[in-house]
Every structure is written in structure tokens, then in C-alpha cells.
Amino acid sequence: MTSRERLENRRASTILDFESMGGLKFTAGVSRYPDGRIAELFLDNHKAGSSIGTLVRDLAITFSFAVQHGADPEAIRRALCRDSQGRALGPLGAVLDLIAAETQR
């Protein structure tokens, strides 16, 4: 396993609000390494105490852990479930699509 690339204690993050999974509302916080690579992702939905909130927070922790150990965020994005038009079916895919679109601008 690749060793973890630590983050600075203080870092800027971007907040994104978006919908996924049939209109459920989510908020994402995205932190980056100084060179611009994604370093950390926080996900939450807008229903305190819900099961989906727990799942998306755990998903974001897993994603963050993976990229801090060398996983390619773009490879993860491409591997996630999509519908027949190529749209992300889940919140992680949806937020990674938003990040990819912002990066291409």
C-alpha cells in the first residue's frame, strides 16, 4: 500500500450544493493539495440523522482515504454507476462530475 500523503492542517475548501438520486439534496466540501489535486471530500445530505447521510459521509471518507493513498480520482469517477445517458447515479459520481466539469473550464 502506498503511504498516506498528509494534508496541511489548514487548507481551503470549495463547497458545492447539488442534487442526486432522484432529487435528494447534498452538500460537498472539496479540499485540495497545494498543487490542485483533490485531497479530501466531505459529503452530507440535508436530513439530519438519516441513513443516507451516514452512507454518503462514509463514502466520502473512503474516497478521501483512497486518494490520499494514491488512487486516481478520475479513475474512480469513471468506474462509478451511470445511467444509459452517462449521468452518475449516485452522489459521489455526481460530485466528481461537477468537479471534473469545473476543472475543464
Regions found by a protein language model. Give the residues of each.
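Long, C-terminal-biased catalytic regions of enzyme "large/alpha" subunits
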Residues: 1-105
